[in-house]
């Protein structure tokens, strides 16, 4: 009887331990990551691995990837999906959230809020693509907005804070964005070789 109780306790403890382990992306869903497009359509874009860098004086971790690009550069949907949010907050500025297949969501943050000669004088018309709204169905590569530095990014260089979440949890996507950039760069620099490059 004691042995039986001990086994039950061990079983319950092991179940609890498993439930506390952070959820990892299932292997079958890596197909989505391997097929995403680079989120900014501008050859002058650049980025580095800033996942979990300390921000706000060390008060928070950076759970995304910042892509620097010229102000007003086109932001594109990295995959097919449906627009979940088109909004403005004091911290994020103008931002977009798009739902994708199998529990994925992409976030595009700090979109443009400036017009020529007048910082912060712009509105959603300089942040989002024309007539872009919640509920829209978007295709991979479709222009959805424009690079800027709205929200708490005011005063920084123009950039897109890009994030991918799986079942609500932000993921470290640097390697996949680097791969998407390499494909984008090749297609821009060597357009005649487009077909062969798409195979790789």
What function would you assign to each model-found segment?
Residues 68, 99-101, 165:
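A generic structural motif
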Residues 143:
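Glycine-rich acetyl-CoA-binding "A-motif" of GNAT/NAT acetyltransferases
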Residues 5-23:
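Sec-dependent N-terminal signal peptides of Gram-positive bacterial secreted proteins and lipoproteins
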Residues 147-161:
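Active-site loop architecture of trypsin-fold serine endopeptidases
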Residues 78-130, 157-159:
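Zn2+-dependent peptidoglycan hydrolase active-site motif and core
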Residues 1-3:
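N-terminal secretory signal peptides that target proteins for export/translocation
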Residues 20-95, 114, 139-140, 149, ...:
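Surface-exposed, glycine-biased beta-strand/turn segments
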């Amino acid at each position: 009887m004691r042995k039986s109780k001990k086994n039950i306790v061990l079983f319950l403890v092991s179940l609890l331990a498993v439930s506390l382990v952070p959820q990892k992306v299932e292997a079958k869903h890596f197909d989505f990551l391997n097929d995403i497009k680079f989120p900014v359509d501008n050859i002058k874009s650049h980025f580095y691995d800033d996942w979990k860098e300390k921000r706000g004086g060390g008060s928070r971790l950076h759970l995304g990837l910042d892509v620097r690009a010229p102000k007003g550069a086109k932001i594109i949907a990295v995959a097919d999906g449906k627009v979940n949010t088109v909004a403005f907050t004091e911290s994020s500025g103008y931002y977009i959230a798009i739902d994708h297949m199998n529990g994925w969501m992409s976030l595009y943050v700090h979109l443009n809020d400036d017009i020529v000669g007048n910082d912060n004088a712009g509105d959603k018309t300089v942040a989002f693509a024309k007539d872009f709204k919640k509920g829209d169905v978007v295709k991979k590569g479709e222009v959805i907005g424009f690079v800027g530095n709205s929200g708490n990014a005011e005063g920084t260089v123009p950039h897109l804070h890009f994030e991918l979440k799986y079942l609500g949890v932000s993921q470290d996507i640097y390697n996949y964005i680097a791969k998407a950039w390499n494909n984008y760069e090749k297609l821009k620099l060597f357009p005649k070789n487009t077909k062969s490059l798409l195979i790789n």
